[in-house]
Amino acid sequence: MPGDVGRVLVVDDSQVIRQLIKVNLELDGFEVMTASDGEECLEAVHRFAPDVITLDLAMPRLDGMRTVGRLRVDARTAQIPLVLVSASAAPEVPVGVDAVLAKPFEPAELVGLVRALCERARKRAVHLAKPLAERRCPSRTLAP
């Protein structure tokens, strides 16, 4: 069933790339929504509530790094893992980005990376859902 693995917002100005990423993720069980630039991403992110966002670096209106900046300053989206997908990807991961995927990429590499980030985000959400006292000190009982 779509979405069992996670929800991904794919942001790229190329319809071909959006479709390529979407199809590969959907084949692996992800629910996918697409946006053609950073502005559309910011409009869609609250409606769709993705577990991971993939972002192209060079897009019209609002590029990938400016979109990253806006997502990171919004408390509602600050913790969503972000993958920068770009033909001109730098070897190091820019501040605010969780991973970089260079174009062209292997579909298995994309799916594996997104899956790992979804799992990490879910573990973090489970951890944060625990009461603060439980996170700080595991329960300690004295044996009778």
Name each model-derived stretch:
Residues Q19-L27:
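Charged docking surfaces used in two-component/phosphorelay signaling
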Residues G29-S36, A44:
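Short hydrophobic/Thr-rich beta-strand motif most characteristic of the beta2 strand and flanking loop
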Residues S36-E40, D51, D63-G69:
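Acidic catalytic/metal-coordinating carboxylates
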Residues E43, M65-A78:
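Short amphipathic alpha-helix used as the core "switch/output" element in two-component signaling
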Residues F48-T54:
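Active-site beta3 strand of CheY-like receiver
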Residues D56, S86:
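Active-site residues of response regulator receiver
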